[in-house]
Amino acid sequence: MSQTQRMRLSTGVELDVWTAGDRANPPIIFLHGFPDSHRTWRHQMAGLSDRYFCIAPDQRGYARSDKPQGIAAYKVPVLVADVLALTVSEAAQLF
């Protein structure tokens, strides 16, 4: 079963995040490309959620996640910081 949650990250953005599987299992984070959303990974998540805890965010600028203004808000180091912040946030919930 999958569920959606809105997560405020330490980077200042809120992302919609879909999860599936048991939090006790090893995690996998699925990251979509341009111009997709978490739905890119729905079939993989369904197939892997019995063995892994699957995490698929709608990254900044996509779907219902926050859409900060300005090109600087979408540079690679900023996007990487979002993923790291998501990882830290999920890890805090896992342990």
Regions found by a protein language model. Name each.
Residues 1-14:
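N-terminal cap/lid segment of alpha/beta-hydrolase-fold proteins
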Residues 2-4, 40-43, 47, 78-85:
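Alpha-helical elements of Rossmann-like donor-binding domains used by nucleotide-donor carbohydrate transfer enzymes
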Residues 10, 18, 56-95:
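Active-site loop/oxyanion-hole signature of alpha/beta-hydrolase fold enzymes
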Residues 16-67:
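Conserved HGGG/HGGXW glycine-rich cap/lid loop of the alpha/beta-hydrolase fold
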